[in-house]
Design a protein with these regions (language model features):
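Non-transmembrane, aqueous-exposed alpha-helical and coiled segments at domain scale
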Residues: 1-376
Length: 376
């Protein structure tokens, strides 16, 4: 069976923490089931944690290691546009190997990746970044500044520090071989991009699919059919968040108590997140900034507005919703700028339902109609 090259990029459509880790793992598993050789790619730095739940139900929050480590046949790759804190990467490898995952023989670290050194973290912690902008102060901005000044050290400059963690080389100089699938887990969210309109309350890079492709060293223009082989998953959530503190404007800011939800904490700093109302404008910007025609939307955490969907995996369960919950979810879906691009709704930390936007409307309408019949 002939299997074409695929390139999938998972991006955040708001301000981060939209469940990109789970969606990335979903895509990896789909490509593996189609017979691809899958490259699970992590880019950028350790200021963002990506959460996945493995088959044993264990929750992993990874800052450096690609989330595909839970799939033993996936090739793991940290791209050239990454900043690597060696201590973080080593601790993650030790933790997952203690749980039975073998990663060193299948982890490739690009020699051009930037070595994030302890002094980068110290520089940010001694600055006013956290107070002024809500920064996590993990050294990424300082490392990138050194890279721009050409004073940063690359992995290839300090190979002895990394050679026992993985293979220091590009796993695929010709990346678009038939049968290969690259799944890139982007970091942050579109609204945190350096040029997305929220400066200075932003991260130190842009956060679109094309930016993450550059960080990974790949390009969709090398694919045989860009509209068929390239897919950007824009992940959004009902109530977007921003990190704690003075981290910038958040439309319709509210509280976890008012929403009736348990307060969330940031993956890296463990501070309580700020939370807001769904804002169609930032999602619309994210869709078009990421290519529109190649975009598919994953609506995460649908169970927060329709609790009966918690753990659901079948589309039929949407039609079985109580009318009140179906109406709330339908109202949310209608706010999404291009709802027909929806291909998935998340129903929990490790569960989701695959469907199309049209199917979702039909299922929700069926649930609402059932309630109307009962009223009659």
């Amino acid at each position: 069976m002939h299997v074409d090259t695929r390139l999938d990029v998972v991006v955040g459509g708001q301000f981060g923490s939209e469940s990109k880790g789970r969606v990335t793992l979903d895509v990896i598993r789909k490509r593996l089931s189609q017979g691809h050789v899958v490259f699970s790619v992590r880019v950028a730095g350790p200021n963002a944690g990506h959460v996945v739940i493995d088959e044993a139900g264990h929750r992993w929050a990874m800052r450096q290691l690609p989330v595909g480590f839970v799939e033993p046949s996936a090739v793991l790759f940290i791209g050239p546009g990454s900043e690597i804190d060696r201590r973080v990467l080593a601790s993650e490898i030790e933790a997952v190997e203690a749980a039975g995952y073998e990663v060193r023989d299948r982890l490739y670290i690009h020699p051009e990746a930037t070595y994030l050194e302890p002094h980068h973290i110290v520089a940010e912690k001694h600055s006013d970044l956290t107070k002024r902008l809500g920064s996590t102060a993990k050294g990424i901005g300082a490392a990138r500044a050194d890279r721009i000044w050409r004073t940063a050290r690359r992995v290839s400059d300090v190979p002895a520090l990394f050679e026992n963690l993985g293979r220091i080389r590009n796993p695929a100089p010709v990346w678009n071989a038939p049968g290969w699938a690259w799944v890139i887990e982007g970091t942050q969210g579109y609204g945190l991009g350096l040029h997305a309109g929220h400066y200075p309350y932003c991260t130190s890079s842009n956060a679109r699919a094309i930016d993450f492709c550059a960080m990974a060293g790949v390009t969709p223009w090398d694919l045989p059919d860009i509209y068929d082989s390239f897919r950007v998953w824009v992940v959004v959530r009902p109530n977007p968040i921003r990190v704690a503190g003075n981290s910038g404007e958040l439309a319709g800011e509210t509280s976890w108590t008012d929403l009736g939800l348990e307060a969330e904490r940031t993956t890296v700093t463990q501070k309580i997140r700020r939370v807001g109302q769904f804002d169609p404008s930032i999602v619309n910007q994210a869709i078009y900034a990421n290519g529109h025609r190649v975009v598919r939307i994953a609506l995460a955490m649908a169970d927060q507005v329709a609790p009966a969907l918690a753990g659901a995996t079948e589309a039929s369960e949407v039609a079985d919703l109580e009318p009140e919950q179906a109406m709330v979810l339908r109202d949310l879906v209608e706010k999404i700028p291009v709802p027909y691009l929806i291909r998935q709704i998340g129903t929990g930390p490790s569960t989701h339902i695959d469907l199309t936007g049209d199917d979702l409307f039909d299922l929700l309408d069926a649930a609402v109609a059932t309630g109307a019949e009962v009223d009659l």
